[in-house]
Amino acid sequence: MDIDLLWSFGGWFFILFPETINYCMAKLRSTSQISHFTNPRSCSSLFFVALLIITILITMLQSSTSMEVTSLPTHQPTSSNSHDESSTSSTATTTTDLHPKRTHHQSHPKPTRSFEAGAHEVPSGPNPISNR
């Protein structure tokens, strides 16, 4: 097992649990090569930094979802029940054009011009230039 590969994929268990080093294929000459967290402040500071990063990520995700919810049109309740269902359904199905300057293209455009294939001279023979 390659030790560099373990470090790149989170080999922190070697630092936290030094007895797991015995399960590696390569044996270390001494245990002094491994740095241990002897200072409890460094462990707690790493914990708080990780907690801060997770908190920031969660707030960013919540703010992006709340922006999506507020950008959706809301249905206003009508004050009177005299409106028919078609008028309320037409207001509920309105959409917002996100790109107002873009023109809408048809998926299959109608052919507006026809190719003018009138009568024309067709050369005959293997070499049309010499047939003139």
Curated annotation (Swiss-Prot):
- Which spans does this entry mark as compositional bias, Basic residues? 101-111
Biased-composition ranges, Polar residues, are 68-77
Transmembrane spans: 42-62
Q: Region entry Disordered: which residue ranges?
A: 68-132
Give the Gene Ontology MF terms in alphabetical order: receptor serine/threonine kinase binding
Q: Which InterPro entries match?
A: CLE41/42/44
- Origin: domain of life: Eukaryota
Q: Which UniProt keywords apply?
A: Cell membrane, Developmental protein, Differentiation, Glycoprotein, Hydroxylation, Membrane, Secreted, Signal, Transmembrane, Transmembrane helix
> Might you report a single GO cellular component term?
apoplast
**What biological-process terms (Gene Ontology) are attached?**
cell-cell signaling involved in cell fate commitment; phloem or xylem histogenesis; procambium histogenesis; xylem development
Consequence when changing residue 129 to A: No visible effect on tracheary element differentiation
- Which parts of the chain are coiled coil? none
Glycan-linked positions:
126
Biased composition, Low complexity: where in the chain?
87-96
**Outcome (variant: residue 125 to A):** Impaired repression of tracheary element differentiation
Residue numbers bearing the Hydroxyproline modification: 123, 126
Instruction: Kindly indicate where the leader peptide sits in this chain.
Output: 1-26
Can you tell me which family this protein belongs to? Belongs to the CLV3/ESR signal peptide family.
Q: Please identify the protein, giving its name as recorded.
A: CLAVATA3/ESR (CLE)-related protein TDIF
According to the entry, what is the taxonomic lineage of the organism?
Eukaryota, Viridiplantae, Streptophyta, Embryophyta, Tracheophyta
